[in-house]
C-alpha cells in the first residue's frame, strides 16, 4: 500500500522555490496586463460535472479526463479545459455582452505515458464574448502580444489559421467523419505524401479547384502571399469570406507594428472541435511546444444557454516559465538581508523591528532557533550577513566580517535602533 508514497503520478511534478516564484510572477504579470486592457476576472471550480464536457460534439476525449464520483454517485472531472467552464458560466448566468473576461488556473488532461507532456498545467487566458466581427480576434491577439512583451519573452510568433476553410473543403468534397480524422492528421503534420495518397485513394479530381486547395493547404503558411494563393483556389463565397477574415486580422495587427510577431498557417487545424473560425497557435523558436492557443467558438456557449459568438486565447504558463529560464540569466532567489534572533519575552519588539526594516525594502526574517549560535550558523549557511539579537534588555546588531562582530548595541527601542 505504500509503494507509491514517494512518487508523483505520471505527468505531474513538484515545483520548488525559484520556479514557484517565477510561475507566480508570470501569472500576475499576465493578469495585470489583461486587467489594464479592460478584462474582468472569472474563477471556476477545479472540479466540474462530467456532463459539462460531454455534449454532442465531444470536444475533449473521454479518455483524457480524470474522472471520479461525488458523494451522490455523480461523475465529476478535474477540469480538462478552461474555455468550456467559462462558456457554462456565461450561458447559465446570462451575463451582459459584449464581455471581456480573464482567468488563470490549473488544467488536467491524461496524456499518454512517455509522451513528454505534463498532465497538469497552468493556463492564463482571455475571452471576448458577444462580438462576431474581427475586432474580437484583433483584441485577443494584441492583448497576448503585449503581455508576452511585458514578460520579455523573446522570439515568439503567433500563427493565424482558419478552421472554417478546412470545414468548407471537407463539406464540399463529402468526406466522411472517420476519413476526416485521418485527413486532419495529414494536414496538421504537413505529411504531403500521405495527403497525396489520400486524394488518390479517394479518387478525387485533381483538376478540381477545391481538391487543389486541399492538396496545397499544408503548404499555405507564411505572410499575405499565402492569402493571395488561397483566394485564387477558393471555389465558394464561404471559403472566400473565411480567407478574407484572416487577411483583415493580419493586416490590422501588422499596421500596429506587430507584424514580426504574426504569421499565417491555413493548414493549422485545432484538435478541439468547438472552434468554428479563425484559430491561433503561438510558439517560441527555441521551444517545440505551443505557448499560446485558441480561436473563435461561436457555437460553444449555446450548449449552456443563449447562442453567443466568442473568441479566446490561452497562454501556457509552464511553457513561458521554461522559455524565460532558458532565455534569461538564471533566476536568483532574493536572499534574506537580516535575521532577527529574539528571546520569547521580546517577540513583540522583534516583530516591530522586522516590520520597520521591511518598509525599507529589506527582506527580514525572525529566527526559528532558541540558541544564538544556531542562528549564526544558519545565517552563514544561507549567506545572511546581518543578525540582530533582541535581548531581554537591549538590541544588538552583528555583522559577518570573517567572524561575527558587534556593529551596534545598547538601544532598547526598535525605532531608535533603526535610526542609529
Curated annotation (Swiss-Prot):
One of its GO terms (biological process) is L-histidine biosynthetic process. GO terms for molecular function: catalytic activity, acting on a protein; histidine-tRNA ligase activity; transferase activity. It is found in: Cytoplasm. Coiled coil: none annotated. Pathway: Amino-acid biosynthesis; L-histidine biosynthesis; L-histidine from 5-phospho-alpha-D-ribose 1-diphosphate: step 1/9. One of its GO terms (cellular component) is cytoplasm. Keywords: Amino-acid biosynthesis, Cytoplasm, Histidine biosynthesis. This function is generally fulfilled by the C-terminal part of HisG, which is missing in some bacteria such as this one. Heteromultimer composed of HisG and HisZ subunits. HAMAP family: HisZ. PANTHER family: ATP PHOSPHORIBOSYLTRANSFERASE REGULATORY SUBUNIT, HISTIDYL-TRNA SYNTHETASE. Required for the first step of histidine biosynthesis. May allow the feedback regulation of ATP phosphoribosyltransferase activity by histidine. Belongs to the class-II aminoacyl-tRNA synthetase family. HisZ subfamily. This is ATP phosphoribosyltransferase regulatory subunit. It comes from Bacillus thuringiensis (strain Al Hakam).
